[in-house]
Amino acid sequence: GMLEFTMYRLFSMVHECRVHGGSLARNILSRVVMAYVQKKQRVLIRAIKKEGTFEAPHDFSHTIKMCEGYLDHGVKMGEGWLLTAEMLELIHIGVNNIVAVQPFGCLPNHIVAKGMSRKIKDNFPNANIVTLDYDPGSSIINQENRLRLMLANAD
């Protein structure tokens, strides 16, 4: 969701400062904001668990670890490593059928989703992942056919 994407962007700033350096102010600010948002995420997770209707998301530190062995945290094109980590999180909680949607012809996201879905399928043979491009130039028939094929293969 939006919270995870915000945390992904903040973590990318922290990671960039750690790997490539940067101003002390940016380094401190990104770490402080990241810690604050993580604290708020933990409050949200507790509330979702207490309510009991929905599956609570994992803490973002868990999400960060999920893509290790797949992508470096420096990959920031499209949704970068976050898309891969989220697919792996879903598989680990028993969701094997995943539709990765790339809006507006996002080529970097398309490349990451396609490339990593193959590696994920190699490591998790029951994973049924389809990538769909949704933009004005996409054929609706092609999109529907890909979804039908995915559903036909679903467990």
Language-model segments: residues:
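An N-terminal assembly and electron-transfer interface module characteristic of large anaerobic redox
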Residues: G1-D155
